[in-house]
């Protein structure tokens, strides 16, 4: 009996990368300007964009309020990212 090797999930996309690529860059908005708008420090925003900081419930509410999205979108993006990272670490996909 042969065992099929599970496929690796694609490279996990961090919600910060999504923010940069789908919201800030298309709008031509700098990190400095967006940090001011959302009420975060530039350092906090930069850490989020670089994937060094995750989405918390409060951050999701901030993002939703400024971007006109839902907080659940940001929480779901973070949960999906975390699951993909865990699956890659274990070497399998569910």
Language model region names:
Residues 2-29, 73-76:
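A short, Lys/Arg-rich alpha-helix, primarily the initiator
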Residues 28-47:
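Short alpha-helical DNA-recognition segment
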Residues 41, 52, 67, 78-81:
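The DNA-recognition helices of helix-turn-helix-type DNA-binding domains
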Residues 52-65:
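Short, basic-rich loop-to-helix N-cap that marks the start of a DNA-contacting helix
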